[in-house]
Amino acid sequence: LTYYTPEYETKGLLLHXHRMSGGDHIHAGXVVGKEITLGFVDLLRVALEACVQAR
């Protein structure tokens, strides 16, 4: 069972942006795909830090 939290909403939005940017997929915490997605892990980290600070 998965419980709804703001973190899931943030990740969903970032995953959507990742797909639109041409990324292939995310596997084991690393981005696999085109070079344009190299900074995607940094975006996830920043979003997660913002969610943690908001608590």
Curated annotation (Swiss-Prot):
UniProt induction comment: By E.ampelina infection.
Keywords, in A-Z order: Calvin cycle, Carbon dioxide fixation, Chloroplast, Disulfide bond, Lyase, Magnesium, Metal-binding, Methylation, Monooxygenase, Oxidoreductase, Photorespiration, Photosynthesis, Plastid
Residues engaged in binding substrate: R19, H27
Cellular-component GO terms for this entry: chloroplast
InterPro entries named in the record: RuBisCO_lsu_C_sf
GO biological process, one term: reductive pentose-phosphate cycle
SUPFAM superfamilies, per the entry: RuBisCo, C-terminal domain
Main localization (coarse): plastid
Oligomeric form and interacting partners: Heterohexadecamer of 8 large chains and 8 small chains; disulfide-linked. The disulfide link is formed within the large subunit homodimers.
Location of the active site: H18
Protein name: Ribulose bisphosphate carboxylase large chain
Organism: Vitis sp. (Grape)
GO terms of molecular function: magnesium ion binding; monooxygenase activity; ribulose-bisphosphate carboxylase activity
Family that this chain belongs to: Belongs to the RuBisCO large chain family. Type I subfamily.
Oxidoreductase recorded as keyword: yes
Site feature Transition state stabilizer, where: K34
Compartment list: Plastid, Chloroplast
PTM summary: The disulfide bond which can form in the large chain dimeric partners within the hexadecamer appears to be associated with oxidative stress and protein turnover.
Functional summary from the UniProt entry: RuBisCO catalyzes two reactions: the carboxylation of D-ribulose 1,5-bisphosphate, the primary event in carbon dioxide fixation, as well as the oxidative fragmentation of the pentose substrate in the photorespiration process. Both reactions occur simultaneously and in competition at the same active site.
EC primary class: lyase
Cofactor requirement: Mg(2+)
Catalytic activity: 2 (2R)-3-phosphoglycerate + 2 H(+) = D-ribulose 1,5-bisphosphate + CO2 + H2O; D-ribulose 1,5-bisphosphate + O2 = 2-phosphoglycolate + (2R)-3-phosphoglycerate + 2 H(+)
More info: The basic functional RuBisCO is composed of a large chain homodimer in a 'head-to-tail' conformation. In form I RuBisCO this homodimer is arranged in a barrel-like tetramer with the small subunits forming a tetrameric 'cap' on each end of the 'barrel'.
Cofactor note: Binds 1 Mg(2+) ion per subunit.
